[in-house]
From Swiss-Prot:
Predominant cellular place of this UniProt entry's protein: secreted
Annotated SUPFAM superfamilies: Snake toxin-like
Protein name (Swiss-Prot/TrEMBL): Alpha-elapitoxin-Djk2a
Molecular functions (GO terms): acetylcholine receptor inhibitor activity; ion channel regulator activity; toxin activity
Length: 72
């Protein structure tokens, strides 16, 4: 599996057994100015997240691009 790892669309071949790509987003103290924090990566299973954290998991190559931010 090949997943995006950074906002600049750098992709990475995932380690063996990590066949899920994910995009995790959440707000911090600068959310209103900078938008949500974003983490992209690979995992063996879709990661569990805390309240206030959104996650999208997918299982095809390049399926987790950096999300588009729409300023308010």
């Amino acid at each position: 599996r090949t997943c995006y790892k950074t906002y600049s669309d750098k992709s990475k071949t995932c380690p063996r057994g990590e066949d899920i790509c994910y995009t995790k987003t959440w707000c911090d103290g600068f959310c209103s100015q900078r938008g949500k924090r974003v983490e992209l990566g690979c995992a063996a299973t879709c990661p569990k997240v805390k309240t206030g954290v959104e996650i999208k998991c997918c299982s095809t190559d390049y399926c987790n691009p950096f999300p588009v931010w729409n300023p308010r």
